[in-house]
Amino acid sequence: MMGEYSLPEGYKAKIQVVVNPEQKTLKFIDNGVGMTADEVEEYINQIAFSGATDFIEKYKDKTNEDQIIGHFGLGFYSAFMVADEVHIDTLSWQSGATAVHWECDGGTEFDMKDGDRTEVGTTITLFLNEDVLEFCNEYKAREVIKKYCSFMPTEIYLSKENETDEEKKEELLNETLPLWAKHPNECTKEEYLEFYRKVFQDYKEPLFWIHLNMDYPFNLKGILYFPKINMEYESIEGVIKLYNNQVFIADNIKEVIPEFLMLLKGVIDCPDLPLNVSRSALQNDGFVKKISDYISKKVADKLAGMCKTEKEEYDKYWDDISPFIKFGCLKDDKFCEKMTDYI
């Protein structure tokens, strides 16, 4: 149940991305609850045209549940960065609702009238401008979706419009429950290794890993892998992928990830991270500093615990992990305090 709406038997939420190079369009089709004409008026006509500044001012004091990132209105507003024209076709779940068609060419005027959609949900069609036509190519669309949305919690399918029955296929592009979102006790060694190979395209087995799982005082999950380092032949280059609610944000955000951890490979998902601020603001954000300190502490705890309870393994790995530990001690005083007895 969703309000008064009974979901159809076997219902599974999904988003279809449909490319059409001939028409130069990109469609996003969902099977969600749709919108009434009044909701289009509120969420599109009022929010999307209120201006980014007014929108941010309106929502700056909202709680995490109402954070700006991921909010439909602001995301929709940005569609005009790539599209000369945008159409919306939607049908609400509400009994007796009439389908709505809305269109705008990027100015302040729009047209809204009864639509012809027959299934509950929403379709947004972008008529791409000449500078970004690459995005209606299925290969480019697949590349972008896989980079940013490989672990989104709703299934995403990609297809090409007007394909023949023989050609027609929907390709699932994402995993809705990434390994880092599971409890560590539910994960097997093979799952950790498979995830490492898939995300980092590295087929050399890592030495070990740390599964971060924290709900208080902030929400943070992730997995950090210690790769095997051959100092003679390889440079020490790691990568830490930062996610927000399972959506990829960027690699190696040094304002969030302690510098010495850049030698590792891993993923960090922190929905509480403020994304509507500049990189320079992140440097001076006390909350971000707490996140960074927590990550550093968990790594130190893991290494200290390994030295105490798995001394033989710790000694075996020492040649590989010593550059990381020594670098961490130089860069982070608290890390150094915790690791002094284990060097």
What is each PLM-predicted segment?
Residues I68, V86-E109, N129-V132, Y139-I343:
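GHKL/Bergerat-fold ATPase module in large chromosome/replication-associated machines
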